């Protein structure tokens, strides 16, 4: 599959990117090369390969979730610029 300039312009519009002529030309070449590599992968014989989620075995490396002591509400709110009903008051960011 060959990537053309119109497809790169379309992707740029979807991503809301303003690209210069040089950037469009460069990205067209780059994206075309990337798809060429993907097409090369399609040539591999994977009939005897078991599908996996990870290339290597993965183990959960997280620690056990244990509740510990905390500093308490009063101390946490002590340096807050503003608090109400034991909660931090922050500026509204969503209408």
Swiss-Prot record:
InterPro entries reported for this sequence: Asp/Glu-ADT_sf_sub_c, GatC
SUPFAM superfamilies referenced in this protein's UniProt entry, alphabetically: Glu-tRNAGln amidotransferase C subunit
Catalytic activity: L-glutamyl-tRNA(Gln) + L-glutamine + ATP + H2O = L-glutaminyl-tRNA(Gln) + L-glutamate + ADP + phosphate + H(+); L-aspartyl-tRNA(Asn) + L-glutamine + ATP + H2O = L-asparaginyl-tRNA(Asn) + L-glutamate + ADP + phosphate + 2 H(+)
Top-rank taxon: Bacteria
UniProt cross-references to Pfam families, sorted A to Z: GatC
GO molecular function: asparaginyl-tRNA synthase (glutamine-hydrolyzing) activity; ATP binding; glutaminyl-tRNA synthase (glutamine-hydrolyzing) activity
UniProt keywords, alphabetically: ATP-binding, Ligase, Nucleotide-binding, Protein biosynthesis
Record-level GO BP terms: glutaminyl-tRNAGln biosynthesis via transamidation; regulation of translational fidelity; translation
Tagged with keyword Nucleotide-binding: yes
EC number: 6.3.5.-
Subunit structure: Heterotrimer of A, B and C subunits.
Family that this chain belongs to: Belongs to the GatC family.
Cited PANTHER family: GLUTAMYL-TRNA(GLN) AMIDOTRANSFERASE SUBUNIT C, MITOCHONDRIAL
Reported function: Allows the formation of correctly charged Asn-tRNA(Asn) or Gln-tRNA(Gln) through the transamidation of misacylated Asp-tRNA(Asn) or Glu-tRNA(Gln) in organisms which lack either or both of asparaginyl-tRNA or glutaminyl-tRNA synthetases. The reaction takes place in the presence of glutamine and ATP through an activated phospho-Asp-tRNA(Asn) or phospho-Glu-tRNA(Gln).
Protein name (record): Aspartyl/glutamyl-tRNA(Asn/Gln) amidotransferase subunit C
Organism of provenance: Syntrophotalea carbinolica (strain DSM 2380 / NBRC 103641 / GraBd1)
